[in-house]
Regions:
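Surface-exposed flexible segments
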Residues: 52-67, 213-222, 310-320
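Serine endopeptidase catalytic core focused on the charge-relay Asp
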Residues: 90-270, 274, 279, 287-293, ...
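C-terminal subregion of chymotrypsin/trypsin-like serine protease catalytic domains
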Residues: 174, 287-365
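Generic alpha-helix signal with a bias toward terminal, lower-confidence helices
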Residues: 32-35, 56-58, 83-85, 147, ...
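Protease-domain processing segments flanking chymotrypsin-fold serine proteases, especially trypsin-like
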Residues: 4, 8-19, 24-35, 41-46, ...
């Protein structure tokens, strides 16, 4: 715990209190009237503040200090896994193209295990030994929120693009299957055994995927622990809210997240950003555009609320899934114009055979 000698066990006691959903794992500047002031504090996250304070039983009030350090109570709302269809604010209309069939499919579009709703294809990585490409997203996107306590997925499960929620004419594996579940880290509902990641990887079929993240491009590096700093600017490309930017609000936190088969799961050493996502954006890759290192993979977006979004860190993800940066995969060249299939939506009434007859006309000079 990066709190100058304070025992985390002392801080963890606040999780027993009403509405407490997490805490920062490092001392933070206290927030007063929306602005940070130069007073170190232990940040405690609650789903909502009870006002007036007198309405809250004394035994459920967060102490004003822990081991002599002031506490700072921050209201973040209910934090939920964002592959579910949730009532959280949207940034305009969901980008419709991202919910269509894409072949080859770029990161940033709809994807999912055949038993979920829909999430986001985060990025393309490589197996650390073989170098084979891997589709990377969240456990609750690619592995149906498989848990240590109860299993919901097996290796080889069908991965669909777009995700099931976006397939309106019935799932056809010949059309929609893009790969198979290969590896994942089970999540847990045990608050004392919190995970650091919600991540999984799938093996794609042949040349059906691209490495260039939609609206971002190829990754150049993987974030290190020292890179995670408050106010670091990040961007992401997601199924629902498309491309947008945010900043790190807490570089290391413990948080309880609901939406895992009706259970709440615990995560530690994850990071918060300013709100940048909605239901269906889970699995999006957080990217830092560094002047020195290029586009740096910083982690996977996996949860959020009406005021914050939560990511698991890149170095945890690649370490646990035994992956490395994918290099040397050139963009797939487009076929000749007369042979190129147009992109089409699965909810427009077309059959696959009808769609195959549609061609893109060559541009006229």
């Amino acid at each position: 715990l990066k709190m100058e000698g304070i025992k985390e066990e002392s801080v963890r006691q606040v999780l027993k209190l009403v509405n407490v959903v997490g805490y920062s794992l490092a001392l933070q500047k206290k927030i007063v009237r929306g602005l940070e002031v130069d007073v170190p504090a232990i940040r405690v996250y609650v789903s909502r503040k009870i006002r007036p304070l007198e309405a809250l039983a004394v035994e459920h009030r967060i102490p004003e200090s822990i081991e002599g350090i002031k506490t700072d109570v921050i209201e973040v709302g209910e934090v939920v896994a964002l592959a579910q269809r949730l009532q959280v604010p949207f940034f305009g209309v969901p980008p419709e193209k991202r919910t269509q069939i894409w072949r080859p499919a770029p990161p940033g579009v709809s994807i999912g295990h055949y038993q979920i709703s829909a999430g986001t294809f985060g990025c393309l990585m490589a197996d650390a030994v073989s170098g084979d490409p891997l589709i990377v997203s969240n456990n609750h996107v690619l592995a149906n929120a498989d848990m240590r306590e109860e299993h919901h997925a097996v290796k080889g499960d069908m991965i669909l693009q777009p995700g099931p929620y976006d397939i309106r004419t019935g799932i056809n594996p010949k059309i929609h299957k893009i790969g198979e579940l290969d590896r994942w880290v089970p999540v847990t509902s045990d608050p004392a055994a919190a995970e650091t990641v919600d991540c999984a990887a799938a093996s794609p079929f042949g040349p059906n995927v691209l490495s260039q993240i939609l609206d971002i491009g190829d990754l150049d590096d993987i974030g290190k622990e020292a890179d995670f700093k408050s106010q670091l600017p990040l961007c992401k490309s997601g199924r629902t809210t498309g491309y947008n930017e945010s900043k790190i609000a807490d570089a290391t936190a413990y948080i309880k997240v609901s939406g895992y088969h009706g259970k709440t799961c615990a995560f530690r050493d994850v990071f918060f950003t300013t709100q940048c996502a909605a239901g269906g954006d889970s699995g999006s890759a957080y990217v830092w555009k560094s002047l020195e290192r290029g586009k740096v993979f910083m982690g996977l977006l996996f949860a959020g609320s009406s005021s914050v979004t939560v990511g698991c860190k890149s170095f945890h993800v690649v370490g646990r899934l035994k992956m490395k940066l994918l290099k040397g995969l050139p963009p797939a060249p487009p076929p000749p114009p007369e042979e190129r299939l147009i992109e089409f939506s699965t909810d427009d009434g077309q059959t696959w055979e009808q769609a195959k007859t549609l061609r893109v006309r060559p541009k006229e000079d």
